[in-house]
From Swiss-Prot:
Organism: Saccharomyces cerevisiae (strain ATCC 204508 / S288c)
Cellular component annotations (GO), alphabetically ordered: cytoplasm; nucleolus; nucleoplasm; nucleus; preribosome, large subunit precursor; small-subunit processome
Listed name of the protein: Ribosome assembly factor MRT4
CDD domains noted in UniProt: Ribosomal_P0_like (cd05796)
Locations listed in the record: Nucleus, Nucleolus; Cytoplasm
């Protein structure tokens, strides 16, 4: 494995003591991992939810996943050729964007590729993303799944949620015979349109987790050859 370049003084952005200590800790962890593992992969984890992140960490328990401020990760790798910790790492640094995670591992390349190519989890839609489906609440009694399953397999939405449906979600509901009802079908969203906060909350209220979360993997660095290889997994 190639030796690291001579240590240089790297200045991190000025911040409060606690914040600076955290940046220095992450910086040191990255440098230590670079000297420990053969490969480092760049993962893009925008919109990742905590349970999903925990699952990924568990799956790679024998490896090390480091997340931190993009700038801190870039400085640890080296933003420029003359600052890089190891040969050609500055090329990997350029690929850090958004919410970045660095996966350090000795697992072979194909194992890592196949894991992330096949890793897909259902997720609730977020605001400003495209609606995964057209969703209309049927007229009559409002059920907990909003008509996604037969009424005989569902239960009416609890009446205490009626003010939320009417005031927060702006759905024209009312209480009739102790149950939440609407007089006509209510269109929540159309497939492909951009969701606002209200629409995303309604989909979640009705248990619609029709979106998919995939980890984007742009490239990896091989310590043995000092090369960066593009992967473009889920980068479309």
């Amino acid at each position: 494995m190639p030796r690291s370049k001579r240590s240089k003084l790297v200045t991190l952005a000025q911040t409060d003591k606690k914040g600076r200590e955290n940046k220095e800790r992450i910086f040191d962890e990255v440098r230590e991992a670079l000297d420990t593992y053969r490969y480092v992969w760049v993962l893009h984890l925008d919109d990742v939810r905590t349970p999903v992140l925990q699952e990924i960490r568990t799956s790679w328990a024998g490896s090390k996943l480091i997340m931190g401020k993009r700038k801190v990760l870039q400085k640890a790798l080296g933003e420029k050729r003359e600052e890089e910790y190891k040969e050609n790492l500055y090329q990997l640094s350029k690929l850090c964007s958004g919410v970045t995670g660095l996966l350090f591992t000795d697992e072979d390349v194909n194992t890592v590729k196949e894991y992330f190519k096949s890793y897909v989890r259902s997720d609730y839609s977020r605001p400003n993303t495209k609606a995964p489906l057209t969703f209309t609440i049927p007229e009559g009694i409002v059920y907990s799944r909003g008509g996604q399953i037969p009424a005989e397999e569902d239960v009416p939405m609890i009446h205490s949620l009626e003010p939320t449906m009417r005031n927060k979600f702006e759905i024209p509901t009312k209480i009739k015979a102790g149950k939440i009802t609407i007089d006509s079908p209510y269109l929540v969203c159309t497939e492909g349109e951009k969701l606002d906060v209200r629409q995303a909350l309604i989909l979640k209220q009705f248990g619609i987790a029709a979106s998919e979360f995939k980890v984007k993997v742009s490239a990896y660095y091989d310590n043995d050859s000092s090369t960066v290889e593009s992967t473009n997994i889920n980068m479309e």
